[in-house]
A protein has these predicted regions:
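Left-handed beta-helix
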Residues: 2-85
Length: 85
């Protein structure tokens, strides 16, 4: 689960964020920021306990709650958008 990942990962910044991206964060805490493209700058301001995940074909921004992610997965499956999973 995302909560397990958040709890397990060390190396959080001073705001308690997990950042695996070229990023500039301001007034952001408890969030997970991931971007696969090292040449893309991710700018985040004012988020709390959120996920920002940028992959090859999907940008996802949502609360860092396991239920939110599960709901997104169910919605994508129901909409026949499985290629984005």
């Amino acid at each position: 689960t995302w909560e397990s990942l958040y709890s397990y990962v060390s190396g959080k910044d001073e705001g308690g964020n997990i950042v695996h991206a070229t990023a500039r964060l301001s007034a952001t805490s408890g969030s997970i920021i991931v971007c696969k493209d090292a040449k893309k700058l991710v700018i985040v301001k004012g988020l709390k306990d959120c996920m920002v995940v940028d992959s090859d074909n999907v940008l996802m921004v949502c609360p860092r709650q396991d239920d939110a992610v599960k709901e997104i997965l169910v919605d994508l499956t129901a909409a026949d958008k499985g290629e984005y999973l």
